[in-house]
Amino acid sequence: MTTFRFCRDCNNMLYPREDKENNRLLFECRTCSYIEEAGSPLVYRHELITNIGETAGVVQDIGSDPTLPRSDRECPKCHSRENVFFQSQQRRKDTSMVLFFVCLACSHIFTSDQKNKRTQFS
């Protein structure tokens, strides 16, 4: 969240300025030349949050993709041991690496932990 700083002498807005001699960030009033040191060298931070699904890009013929690794993990739905797997497409700090398996027999999507089962896609 962006915060504005104001001059303690004239109440006008303070603007960021670089102190090139000491290599530090300052805030300066353009009206009365009041200067104060910034607590942090960060002026602005823009965090991008994407909202793509965990299984984005899964299509019906995913099993014919030769670039995907194969696994013999048992499908919890049909008990087949032929599947492909891929990593979750969510790239956020708060998510851990999740592997998704797609059964080649029934197209069921599941993860390595059996609690997080996925349904069949069309």
Curated annotation (Swiss-Prot):
A zinc finger (TFIIS-type) spans 71-111. It is found in: Nucleus, Nucleolus. One of its GO terms (molecular function) is zinc ion binding. Zn(2+) 2 binds at C75, C78, C103, C106. Keywords: DNA-directed RNA polymerase, Metal-binding, Nucleus, Transcription, Zinc, Zinc-finger. Component of the RNA polymerase II (Pol II) complex consisting of 12 subunits. DNA-dependent RNA polymerase catalyzes the transcription of DNA into RNA using the four ribonucleoside triphosphates as substrates. Component of RNA polymerase II which synthesizes mRNA precursors and many functional non-coding RNAs. Pol II is the central component of the basal RNA polymerase II transcription machinery. It is composed of mobile elements that move relative to each other. RPB9 is part of the upper jaw surrounding the central large cleft and thought to grab the incoming DNA template. Involved in the regulation of transcription elongation. This is DNA-directed RNA polymerase II subunit RPB9.
